[in-house]
C-alpha cells in the first residue's frame, strides 16, 4: 500500500506539492472514482489510477537498453546538453539513471534503470564486468598492440590499465578493432590507444555485462528490458 500522492510523484507526474493540488482539485481518479485526499492509501499492484482521464500505470523497477548517440551526455539532467534520459520518452518513473557513463562523443549500449542494487553490482570494480567496444583508429594496429594491451598499458594513472583483449578487425591507415576491458576509467580506450601513438576516431560500446546491443536499435532508439 502507498499514498496516492507518492504513487503519482514516483511516476513522474510532478512534485509532491504539485500533485497534492491536482488531487484536491479533483483531477485524479482511483478505480473510476474521484479522490481528493493526497494521503489516501492505495494498492499500487491492483488499483487503477488516472490523471485527467489518462491511466497512470505503476512500475516499481524499469529497465531500458538505449543506443546512445554521439552528442548526448550520460546524465539525468543538464542545463545545456540533451541527456540520455531525455531520449526515454515513455518512461514511467522519475528516478531513472544511466548505469555508468559513456563520453559525450561515444555511442553505443547504455543501460537505464532505477535499480540501484543492480547498478552497484554492474559497476563495482570487484566484479570485473566486461565492456566491449568497437573502434575506428587512425593508424595501423598490429600484434604488438595486442600484446601491449594484454600486458596492461600505462595510461598515466597510479596503476596501469588492467589486461585488455584487443581483437583486430581491419589493419591499415585506418584500423578497426574490438576491445574488451573490465574497467571504466576516464577516457580509458582513447588514452590506451594514445599511449601507442594511435587516435580513436569512432568509439561505440557494443556489449556490457554480457548484454549485447540490439542491432535493430539505431542511435537514439531504445527498448524495454524484462
Model feature map: region roles:
Residues 2-225:
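Basic, flexible Lys/Arg- and Gly-enriched helix-loop patches that mediate nucleic-acid binding at interfaces
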Amino acid at each position: 500500500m502507498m499514498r496516492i500522492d507518492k504513487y503519482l510523484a514516483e511516476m513522474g507526474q510532478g512534485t509532491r506539492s504539485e500533485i497534492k493540488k491536482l488531487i484536491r482539485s479533483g483531477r485524479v481518479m482511483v478505480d473510476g472514482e474521484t479522490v481528493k485526499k493526497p494521503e489516501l492509501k492505495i494498492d499500487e499492484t491492483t488499483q487503477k489510477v488516472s490523471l485527467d482521464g489518462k491511466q497512470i500505470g505503476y512500475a516499481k523497477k524499469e529497465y531500458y537498453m538505449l543506443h546512445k548517440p554521439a552528442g548526448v551526455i550520460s546524465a539525468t539532467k543538464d542545463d545545456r546538453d540533451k541527456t540520455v534520459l531525455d531520449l526515454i520518452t515513455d518512461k514511467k518513473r522519475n528516478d531513472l539513471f544511466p548505469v555508468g557513463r559513456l563520453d559525450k562523443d561515444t555511442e553505443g549500449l547504455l543501460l537505464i534503470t532505477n535499480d540501484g542494487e543492480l547498478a552497484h553490482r554492474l559497476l563495482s570494480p570487484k566484479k570485473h564486468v566486461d565492456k566491449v567496444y568497437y573502434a575506428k583508429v587512425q593508424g595501423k594496429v598490429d600484434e604488438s598492440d595486442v600484446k601491449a594491451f594484454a600486458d596492461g598499458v600505462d595510461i598515466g594513472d597510479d596503476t596501469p590499465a588492467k589486461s585488455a583483449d584487443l581483437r583486430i578487425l581491419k589493419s591499415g591507415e585506418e584500423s578497426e578493432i574490438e576491445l574488451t576491458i573490465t574497467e571504466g576509467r576516464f577516457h580509458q580506450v582513447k588514452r590506451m590507444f594514445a599511449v601507442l601513438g594511435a587516435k580513436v576516431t569512432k568509439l561505440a560500446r557494443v556489449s556490457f555485462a554480457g548484454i549485447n546491443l540490439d542491432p535493430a536499435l539505431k542511435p537514439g532508439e531504445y527498448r524495454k528490458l524484462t
